[in-house]
């Protein structure tokens, strides 16, 4: 614990930016990083991890520090607790592999427990024979006191990587000797280093995020080049803008053009314009941006040396992807399966059961590593943001007095932009989560609620002040960025900017499923763009708009045609029609470009409008049917968004307008992004800061602790037992907190009523919790209120059940073949099943509704990569469940579990 506190105190802003406390540089001082000079020696390794050895006759008596990184707070479970038994370790030696030795035998010693287990990927790792004295096994990596064989290293004890020079050189040595002034070091080969790093990962969230980032970035070269290009674009925009503003003598250009004298760019450039013409404020701004670029370059250097190289070796030697080009074609599921095959070679994830009895309790809290758990770790923070947006915890709408027409455009759907989204995530993530990716312990304690709310509100206000100060510079930068980026596209295809649509940032969070990785989500949205455009184009536009566009298209086309023909006819050596000024300082080329652009825009709009007419239906290769309802249902197969409020109105213009708020014009999104740079400070100060208390309540109430995984968002675990926390429409409307006493009394009433109605206990709990949170009238006051409340419960529950949709989609994308087939069968049964009748919780009547989740989703087959997480009937820890009978559950149980874990630290 003292070691962890010391590391926490040394943690600074720059250390976190540059990754100085990363999992890749938590090694000893004597550890030598990977050197590319030893690549040529891989031919001597013969496919093994350690196929050669280093001979020596003596050893060094060095004093090693007792550093134990496994005791750090890595995953907020009992495996990282100091009170838990010591974790087993394996010595890392360099003796030559013995082919006749049984590599599957595990040897134990009472003085230093360790374990080892073979895997298909590293079958060449042998094990040590049993020794009476294993005190110095950590030193046997280089110092060979006894014959030893290769095994996997663990980080429980410090290891010595130095040795005195041998008497004679050995041709079998795979460690490259480095000459130093006073000592010699040996470089570990890449494959051994990859194994060592994987065996000693202490922050699994950071490592898996880096693995996914490397996969999504298509390798180290593409990641480095992409980040360099971004910095070059920033530097080009700054330098080119300053050059155009203060580096060219435009007065001399205008005077020389009237004299018809030949002028070159060299004549127009002002010498020493940076020191003489550029204002001091602009120089300070350029200095600040230059410092930012330097920091980004330093960060890229650290990431390249300490992250990207290590991840590349990990993919190459352990995942089995020697070439980064294969990352563009390989599926993420294949990488997940290969990661799971390596779990027995990591001290946090090993599930070896052939261990002595004293280690059984320690193995119960091992880090979980399957497809669901990997997605939960990568999406730990994003899952909370998805739930925040879907439950409408954040109030982002603005209301300007005396401007009611403008207020309709300043709703949550239009105000939430990339800039505001980045500021909100920056304030929340750095406040809620610690450096290990886990939720801070004080956030989960109820008595800290008011203090945390004030601190988070102060963070939002500080971010508002910073955005207000940087607003002028950021606005100029983004205007230039969008102009340079989209002008060429607009010039080649004018309709690409004014006619194309894309999903808004608010829609991206609204449509995203829990545990859905970014590349799956982007693919799903891209598949929906075509059907969404077809659905919108089926609705006819206003008659005024259509006729006006026809007139403008005809007039602009006629004028453009006449100007082009006149230029071709009258242009010769004596007369230059293209430079003829139709108006003052406006030549014919200017008007040809202007009217040609108008004609292209109106033509593309009319083409999309008239593409569904009877004249064009016969010319289309594929059959087309005018059916907006069927088109929207087809779009919902990709967006997974079809609220029950749209039922019976899918063909109406109102539903189409609501869908267009999600799928908006691209030019409108760009304008909103620019306006957001001005509105973000006011939204952060007046709106988001007022939601600080609701944000703290959300993280406390919807965070559950999973043994071996830590605290995660409730909805990401796909737990269908507690329906009161599911995505209901009525819960989104509740903003105030209910006292715990009334909630506890409601639970007691619900439990007393459940004795006579055991078949209806789940819906009864839903009704009681919903009545408390929504502050509805008590169901026992009158029979009329019972009927209304029960009807609302069923309608709200089945209106937008996002957690169930996320569960089904996760099975389709990340499950095995059997799981995918099971999910497709159940989804087809759900679509084909007629509405069933569900019993009301408070009476014997029934209402029409959809089947419950327990009927929709069947248990998955065993022996699959997702069996432990995707089966809703799966128990995470059977031994812990047996020992915890009679314990409290729900919120009180979660708090009790948290305090127990907090004491064990």
Swiss-Prot record:
GO terms for cellular component: autophagosome; cytoplasmic vesicle membrane; endoplasmic reticulum membrane; Golgi membrane; phagophore assembly site membrane. Phosphorylated by ATG1. ATG1 phosphorylation is required for preautophagosome elongation. It holds the Pfam family ATG9. Residues 823-835 have a biased composition (Polar residues). Residues 1-227, 294-463, 485-549, 610-665, 687-905 are cytoplasmic. Residues 249-272, 571-588 are lumenal. Its main location: membrane. Homotrimer; forms a homotrimer with a central pore that forms a path between the two membrane leaflets. Forms a homotrimer with a solvated central pore, which is connected laterally to the cytosol through the cavity within each protomer. Acts as a lipid scramblase that uses its central pore to function: the central pore opens laterally to accommodate lipid headgroups, thereby enabling lipid flipping and redistribution of lipids added to the outer leaflet of ATG9-containing vesicles, thereby enabling growth into autophagosomes. Belongs to the ATG9 family. Phospholipid scramblase involved in autophagy and cytoplasm to vacuole transport (Cvt) vesicle formation. Cycles between the preautophagosomal structure/phagophore assembly site (PAS) and the cytoplasmic vesicle pool and supplies membrane for the growing autophagosome. Lipid scramblase activity plays a key role in preautophagosomal structure/phagophore assembly by distributing the phospholipids that arrive through ATG2 from the cytoplasmic to the luminal leaflet of the bilayer, thereby driving autophagosomal membrane expansion. Required for mitophagy. This is Autophagy-related protein 9. The gene is ATG9.
